């Protein structure tokens, strides 16, 4: 089963990035949520740090938090070591971790060895080794995900706002590189990273493929967090959270192929919500793989 999963994931991504699917068209202006997408499409200031073999440490700008600037740490990996751009351009992948995760160097390196330029960022305000960065954004925890706010503006202090912006900006960093084919960039995320992948796929129509693993939408209806978090909101807070932060509000606007992958008995993202997420995607773009025995975890090497 391990090899079957690998074949499904790699095959879908390769086909999409090689142009086997219809490419996305212009952005649907009617669904931008909390984000200034035009600003996120632009390359932010990047600090290029140590490079070791295929992998380089970088920092790029995040969204302001309570009036103060933030930055995002990431590993960027290239298929070939050295500063010179290759004669041909590479496809690229944005790699989005989940709860308890970090910027996984090995994940970026894995995709570089497959022939991609890849970026794996930290979405919990940390630097290398999960050490808290003084300029980092909000940490990933249940309280910051299910952020209780009494206005749309206040929701910008929550984790989802900052994490989605960081993922879209990571795409922009990749697209700015001379060795990257900006028309062949995809995104994949695991668990909460899959949740983010669903949102980003509905917002960032530059993407050519999206692969959320475990993560999905309709968390307000049936998920590990429904009773203890979503149902504790006031009706107004719940409406606001669903409208701005649940993937169900964005999946209908996906314009690239999207492959949903989950285990048959996932303990966090339940299959009924997973199925509804798949069904919300426009016809012809959604693909679904439910795997017996797939355990929940950061299984990026499978």
Stretches found by the model and what they are:
Residues 265-267, 271-302:
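Catalytic cores of secreted or luminal carbohydrate-active enzymes
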Residues 254, 260-262:
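Short beta-strand/loop motif that positions the catalytic acidic residue
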Residues 87-98:
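Short beta-strand element of the alpha/beta-hydrolase
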Residues 103-105, 109-165, 216-231:
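Cap/lid segment of the alpha/beta-hydrolase catalytic domain
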Residues 37-88:
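N-terminal cap/lid segment of alpha/beta-hydrolase-fold proteins
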Residues 84-88, 145-190:
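Gly/Ser-rich "nucleophile elbow"/oxyanion-hole loop immediately N-terminal to the catalytic nucleophile
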Residues 168-240:
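Primarily recognizes the serine-hydrolase "nucleophile elbow" in alpha/beta-hydrolase
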Residues 10-22:
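Bacterial N-terminal signal peptides
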